[in-house]
Amino acid sequence: MYDVTSIQNLKKDVLYFVAKASFEGTLEEERDLIPEKMIEGPEPTFRCCIYKEREIVRQRIRLAEGKAPGAEDDGNIVQVIKSACADCPISSYVVTNNCQNCLGKDCIKACRFGAIEPGHTRSRIDPQKCKECGMCAKACPYNAIAHVSRPCKDSCPVDAISYDEYGVSVIDEEKCIRCGQCAAKCPFGAIGTKTWITNVIADLKAGKKVYAILAPATEGQFGKDITMESWRQAVKKAGFEDLIEAGLGGDMTTCSEAEEWLEAYRNGEKRTTSCCPGFVNMIRKHYPDLADLISTTVSPMCAVSRMIKARDPDAVTVFVGPCVAKKSEVADQKIEGNADYALNYNEILAIMKAKDVELEPAENTYQDSTIFGKFYGNSGGVTDSVLEYMKETEQNEDIKVCKANGAAECKKALMFLQRGRLPEDFIEGMACEGGCVGGPSRNEEIIKARKVRENLIKSADDRKITDNLKRYDMDSFSMHR
């Protein structure tokens, strides 16, 4: 019997089965058999019956192949797995057992919509009439009315999630910024993201030169002994041509951003960063009048991809990291020379496992980027890097930067910018709290990984940004969209 001890195990196992079958060339034959292999039955282990469990696996297989889980596909990277949804309560406010059925009936008096009725043992809220204003909860002297909402809806920073008539979550394509927080927060795993693992495997099997671009947020995510060299050795064993740190792209981005910031500052203009695709999506969808203020500098991922393709036009580039929005940058933004694919940690590990490759401890000897490029994975890292570059090049302007840490702070900063009330000159926006290290597909919680991450980065050499960039032909590719 398949034992699901966590939703993470289910996600990982589906990816592994798909990756293994893809390498073996048997996915067409195995596709319909994988659910039965994983869910043997006869007793269910995590849902009401084995048939629902198998359908959940079946829809996750479709996601693993880069398809929508159901028949309809709106093009969004983030998708609701309908067979796994609808088990959460929809009613936002509920009367709990704390209700004393008192004579005061303050809750009923506070409701302006007639949504609360007296009951035999406690008051009752009619969900059809309730407007979720919360006045009843505030009025109850016993705190007997609780605010209960779905984790997916709570986690969405742009109110892109609602429900259909059957209680299944619906993602509004026009509002969604692809941050992926809903997928991370759903305790039933009812929201997932499309993957490109079958595409990457097809290119590996075809003998193409596939390069991994590893996110700077990776250091610290897998323990103190797993270094960039560990990753480089592992992906090469799995068939990749080589691995390049995306932090190197951070150094490249820093140089270009510094030039943009200085020009804008001297012209009295405001700007926002462009390296976080979730933040960029937020601006374009919810503050479109500010879109022209987005830096034209490409992301570190794109910078490294362009560098690789300038050397080898036939190269295939694959970003690896904790970010869901990077998939959106690849699929939606269509930036020339950008990475061909983006994978999260579970997806690259599934590819490695299918090739019997594991991450192994290795000395921290491999380094492409400066320490400042490595800290691009943290909120505030872009600002620190740009200011360091200005210092190195003796361009010391009194530039003020708003470091917007997380979607809520991003919205606040953009609102001030929109109204002409932003006191700072620039906004560094990170849609995830903590920066990329807080991405929805992270392998470890920020607080647990922090010390390990800091120690790994401290062990790197202290090369300057300007010196590091001299190693590369920066004139062979453009740093702008």
Each language-model region and where it sits:
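Residue-level recognition of alpha-helix initiation/capping sites
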Residues: C102, K131, H147, I177, ...
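Iron-sulfur cluster-binding cysteine motifs and their immediate structural context
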Residues: G104-P127, K131, M135-I177, Q181-I197, ...
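Short strand-loop junctions, especially beta-strand C-caps/beta-turns
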Residues: N98, Q128, A215-A217
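Glycine-rich adenosyl-nucleotide cofactor-binding module
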Residues: C88-K109, K138
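N-terminal [4Fe-4S]-dependent radical SAM core
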Residues: G70-T96, F113-G114
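Iron-sulfur-associated redox domains of electron-transfer enzymes in respiratory
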Residues: M1-R60, A64-G66, T193-R481
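Gly-rich Lys/Arg/Thr-decorated short loops/hinges at beta-loop-alpha junctions or inter-strand turns
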Residues: C88-V94, E117-R122, Y163, Q181, ...
